[in-house]
Amino acid sequence: MQAAHPIERAVGMEYYVSDADGVGGRLRSSPADFRVRELEAFDTEPVDADTGAYPHLVFRAELRNWETNDFASKLSDRLGISRERVSWAGTKDKRAVTTQLFSVKGVAAGDLPEIGGTDIEVIGRAGRPILFGDLAGNAFEIVVRDTENTDNAASVVADLRAFANGDDSVTSEGWSSDATLPDGDTTVGVPNYFGQQRFGSRRPVTHEVGLAIARGEWKDAVLAYVGNPNEREPESTQEARGYVDETHDWAGALDRLPGALGYERSICHRLVENGASEPADFREALEALPSNLQSLFVNAAQSYVFNRILSERLERGLPFDRPVEGDVVCFRDSDAPEDFPIPDADRTQEVTAKRLSTVERHCERGRAFVTAPLVGTDTELGSGEPGDIAREVLDDVGLEQGDFDLPGAFDSDGTRRAILLRTDLGVERDSADLTFSFSLPKGSYATVLLREFRKGDPDA
């Protein structure tokens, strides 16, 4: 186990589980180096089905260098319809080639426009829109270019294979200095951290905003979002955010904040209008943001706490592949593909001493998964040492479960999430480039696996 990069530690990912040195290299040298294909889980009727019963046209789109929201906005503009009539199952990053399903209400197949950087294939019709989460997972093919030590990849694979199986024999020197890349796929495992994208890749602050909101510190939440300069931003943006931190002059901030920072400017406009004299004024300014962004702040705070819980579990040497007394496990989704087990966070059970050996067998056979809380008002924290870890992390960030009883879109009941991410990984070497092929359940991050190989700046 090694200490992670400082940017990763700032969002709760405190360790790499692999002791082997990294390969370095660059991610996303071009969009084609990061390919994502949805593993679809949405049924459709034929394209010529009755439009009254099946008003939603479903199509598969390959997007090249398109962020999902931007494509949906462009599509709705070209169709002359509300953006709310376009739906999809999962949001994908821009600098990639992505293949995913969309649905559009009240549109004929022939109405779909040609849009640069996209290929569209009509699939059929449906009686309801595609909803967020209507997928089994995602298949990835990712190229890391210009690695500094390609040979290290084999040792990382060996370490991650051991972690997936709960093997404690990895040493501080790494698994094997003379390891070779296996032929075909190898089952590997990593902690199921929330990746850097959850918090902001270049400026990871969304969790800071969410933590302040959960504490009821509304002004601090605004300052964390509008102020709080980051060295990776343009100098003019850093100066504008620094001005906010120093002066709390919202009118002056509007003169300095770039037009591209639309949400920050919206907050400042609202504060100029309401006087910014009471905590409720700052809450009102945040509530003026889109509801999905409000939820994102609190979700990022929950994700940060989750990452901290996983890091503490690593620090204490507790297993990830099997439970200890006091853990809460969830069971396999009965609707998941036979060869692609997916955890069902709605079916949980706390592990008692009496049930420990039985649940261990379920985990070994892929029928159950150890979980940790995404803390909200109704989350079960567990007991024993796992419960202690969750409560200690909450105490360290100054929160209690009841703090997530928040107004409107900020409110969250919480849930649970599997702590071990397993996948069958293929690695191919071409000179100094490495190509990684694997599939992950929905909600898990490819970069969380790749960070174990690169071991460096996640934004490089």
Curated annotation (Swiss-Prot):
Q: What is its EC number?
A: 5.4.99.27
Q: Where is the active site?
A: 93 (nucleophile)
Q: Which InterPro entries match?
A: PsdUridine_synth_cat_dom_sf, PsdUridine_synth_TruD, PsdUridine_synth_TruD_CS, PsdUridine_synth_TruD_insert, TruD_catalytic
What Pfam families does this protein map onto?
TruD
Q: Which GO terms describe its molecular function?
A: RNA binding; tRNA pseudouridine(13) synthase activity
Q: Does the keyword tRNA processing apply?
A: yes
What is catalysed by this protein?
Answer: uridine(13) in tRNA = pseudouridine(13) in tRNA
HAMAP family the record matches: TruD
Outline what the protein does.
Could be responsible for synthesis of pseudouridine from uracil-13 in transfer RNAs.
Q: This chain belongs to which protein, by name?
A: Probable tRNA pseudouridine synthase D
The record lists the organism as Haloarcula marismortui (strain ATCC 43049 / DSM 3752 / JCM 8966 / VKM B-1809) (Halobacterium marismortui)
